[in-house]
Amino acid sequence: MGAPPGYRPSAWVHLLHQLPRADFQLRPVPSVFAPQEQEYQQALLLVAALAGLGLGLSLIFIAVYLIRFCCCRPPEPPGSKIPSPGGGCVTWSCIVALLAGCTGIGIGFYGNSETSDGVSQLSSALLHANHTLSTIDHLVLETVERLGEAVRTELTTLEEVLEPRTELVAAARGARRQAEAAAQQLQGLAFWQGVPLSPLQVAENVSFVEEYRWLAYVLLLLLELLVCLFTLLGLAKQSKWLVIVMTVMSLLVLVLSWGSMGLEAATAVGLSDFCSNPDPYVLNLTQEETGLSSDILSYYLLCNRAVSNPFQQRLTLSQRALANIHSQLLGLEREAVPQFPSAQKPLLSLEETLNVTEGNFHQLVALLHCRSLHKDYGAALRGLCEDALEGLLFLLLFSLLSAGALATALCSLPRAWALFPPSDDYDDTDDDDPFNPQESKRFVQWQSSI
């Protein structure tokens, strides 16, 4: 299969494509993109399930660590205000983990933007291909209608005017037959007319899904950013209630991070299988959805010398018919106009129609060449297999950093808030001190009672 211009499978595609795949029975599955097959679906689900396994192991590790911390902690002597050894190390490890999580959030924003750019490039390529196909249909329809109108009006009028001269009538009828033949050949060039699959509809569906995917990731990134910032604030202010609330939120974001990691990993693996050799799948799917012949689809997907233009014969016959019409009209203009001046008007109208038809024909020749649609195909692959896949890998790195940072924070936060001084420590001030909170409270109560 020939590669589209400017597209070559990247190193990431080759690396992910080489990873082994297995179904639920752990039997090997070929790395061929086949989403309709059950074994391949199971292989991708198994990749996503690895993230679920990681989540389970993380939760077990956190639970065991916290149980050990709660049950095996040596009792502190009553009234002791000496911080336990290693307390500062625990707090700083939590801070470093949260800062690493913030770094992962930055990577996540970049990956989300890259993925969105790749999908936007895919949508733009589909829209340009839809414009090309619509232009072909419009030009064919306009040209056929012009030729049909010329046959019904100008050529009929010309035959009536030239009726006294049999040989001139025969020439006009020859031009009629050539116009009808050209219209018939041109009508077969609108190969996408009536096809149920619309690139415009596909582009709209892709953009619709991408908008919600982008928004979901932005909300996830902002949620984790808020959790990290408020946790750091709680540690700085030594606010126990804020740290406890953020611990619960960290657990929620940890679950979301592992879930997004599984989705990203399965998508990246499946996308690498598609991008390693996209032509067979695109060819089969498009043929199934459109019903077009494999010759037409192969011509536009491959666009090389090994595949001939399936419209070449129709184009040649149409060009020959238009040339014959042109020569016959020139002959009629030389011989008929001096004898039948009233024939000049329909002849001029026919020449104008022929000039417009030839202009449309040359546009059709350029549009029907494989270069334009094949270029759109290559742009779509570059957007999907380069930018979008790279963005997915950055999102995968974000999820990994996020899961590690939050797991570390969940282990450190309970130990950190256990080191916070109790609220009673703030009451160990002189009772006669006017700035003592308790004394101020009693003073306000005394004033209200007066």
Curated annotation (Swiss-Prot):
Molecular function GO labels: calcium ion binding; chloride channel activity; intracellularly calcium-gated chloride channel activity; iron ion transmembrane transporter activity; volume-sensitive chloride channel activity
Glycosylation sites: 130, 205, 284, 355
Cell location: Cell membrane
Membrane topology: Multi-pass membrane protein
Site (Essential for the formation of the channel-pore): 165
Chief localization: membrane
InterPro entries found in the cross-reference section: Tweety (IPR006990)
Record topology, Extracellular segments: 1-43, 110-214, 262-390
Disulfide bonds: 275-385, 303-370
Record Pfam families: Tweety
Keyword terms, alphabetized: Cell adhesion, Cell membrane, Chloride, Chloride channel, Disulfide bond, Glycoprotein, Ion channel, Ion transport, Membrane, Phosphoprotein, Transmembrane, Transmembrane helix, Transport
Tissue specificity of this protein: Expressed in brain, eye, ovary and testis, and at lower levels in muscle, placenta, liver and lung.
Residue positions where Phosphoserine is found in the record: 440
Record's GO cellular component terms: chloride channel complex; filopodium membrane; filopodium tip; membrane; plasma membrane; smooth endoplasmic reticulum membrane; synapse
Listed CDD domains: Tweety_N
Reaction(s) catalysed by this chain's protein: chloride(in) = chloride(out); L-glutamate(out) = L-glutamate(in)
Cytoplasmic side: 65-88, 236-240, 412-450
GO biological-process terms attached to the record: cell morphogenesis; cell-cell adhesion; cell-substrate adhesion; chloride transport; filopodium assembly; gene expression; iron ion transport; L-glutamate transmembrane transport
Region (Disordered): 428-450
PTM notes: N-glycosylated. Contains high-mannose, hybrid and complex oligosaccharides.
Transmembrane regions: 44-64, 89-109, 215-235, 241-261, 391-411
Family: Belongs to the tweety family.
PANTHER family: PROTEIN TWEETY HOMOLOG 1, TWEETY-RELATED
Known function: Calcium-independent, swelling-dependent volume-regulated anion channel (VRAC-swell) which plays a pivotal role in the process of regulatory volume decrease (RVD) in the brain through the efflux of anions like chloride and organic osmolytes like glutamate.
Oligomeric and partner information: Homotetramer; disulfide-linked. Homodimer.
Protein name: Protein tweety homolog 1
Organism: Homo sapiens (Human)
Gene for this chain: TTYH1
